[in-house]
A protein has these predicted regions:
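C-terminal substrate-binding subdomain of Rossmann-fold SDR/epimerase-dehydratase oxidoreductases
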Residues: 4, 35-36, 173-264
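N-terminal Rossmann-like NAD(P)+-binding domain of SDR-like oxidoreductases, especially those catalyzing
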Residues: 1-155, 195
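Residues that form or flank phosphate/diphosphate-binding pockets in enzymes
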Residues: 15-16, 41, 160, 222-226
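Hydrophobic alpha-helix immediately C-terminal to the catalytic Tyr-X-X-X-Lys motif of short-chain
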Residues: 131, 135, 139, 169, ...
Length: 264
């Protein structure tokens, strides 16, 4: 809607639905190819033939629980997939805006991380995203790749996959089931509405210099238990009837918190 031409590439794995794109499929400035980001040669063709200036790399496996059960697909998609994309960018001269995660910093404890802080990923998902970041910066140093790195906090919004926390809460309550809550439920996350992340991304894309890293966050923190209680309050349901405490997951970071002052 802002005059940009957009070319989408999506493998439509279990978490992707073409139906989510129904509002843009008929737009004259939107095109779509269904393929894996591991298809490097096809990516080169798409970028070159469509004169694509920026590749916005959002493709990733992101569910931490799944990464603990089986990390192979996370390494394949998040690391090898990123390598495939930046190989295509280097070959065609395109720049990349790479989406990472606030989880690469590790547990925040009392501080809010800034972009220059060291990375300390503590689960297979965040480790795969940190590895992808290092690939991007290594290609910048070695091959002259131009990039922007974005590290967002927890996003929520329309059409989010049902495995994520807020959709899980809503689905469980709707079905009359209890919401499983890890440990004591006091793990804290920083929440941001997806449209605000989109606005921030556009601002960065239009205003940033090359080879910069940005935290993107709202400053709004809430513990997992309190998120459930808030949803229950909105829906008029007794929170005591909605929560089932379960064994904490391995390596569960207590808190994530990032400082996005650089965007101001």
């Amino acid at each position: 809607n802002n005059g940009y031409g957009v070319y989408g590439v999506d493998a439509f794995t279990y978490a992707g639905k073409k139906e989510n794109l129904k509002n843009v499929m008929d737009k004259p400035n939107f095109n779509l190819t269904e393929c894996s980001i591991l298809s490097t040669e096809l990516l080169k063709i798409i970028i070159k033939e469509n004169d694509i200036k920026w590749v916005i790399h959002l493709a990733a496996e992101t569910h931490v629980d799944n990464s603990i059960k089986d990390s192979d697909v996370f390494l394949r998609t998040n690391v090898n997939g990123t390598k495939s994309i930046i190989d295509a960018c280097v070959a065609t001269g395109s720049k990349i805006l790479h989406f990472s995660t606030d989880e690469v910093y590790g547990c925040a404890f009392d501080e809010s991380f800034v972009e220059s802080d060291k990375l300390d990923p503590r689960n297979p998902y965040s480790a795969s995203k940190a590895a992808a970041e290092h690939l991007v910066t290594s290609y910048a140093n070695t091959y002259g790749l131009k990039y922007i790195m974005v590290r967002p906090s927890n996003n929520f919004g329309p059409r989010q996959h049902s495995e994520k926390f807020l959709p899980t809460i809503l689905k469980k309550i709707k079905n009359g089931d209890k919401v499983p809550l890890y440990g004591d439920g006091l793990h804290e996350r920083e929440w941001m509405y997806v449209k605000e992340t989109s606005k921030a991304t556009r601002f960065i894309l239009e205003n940033s210099k090359d080879n910069q890293v940005y935290n993107v966050s709202s400053g709004f923190h809430m513990k997992n238990l309190h998120v459930i209680q808030k949803v229950c309050d909105i829906l008029g349901v007794d929170p005591q009837d909605c929560v089932e405490y379960v064994k904490d997951r391995p390596g569960h970071d207590r808190k994530y918190s990032i400082d996005s002052t650089k965007l101001n």
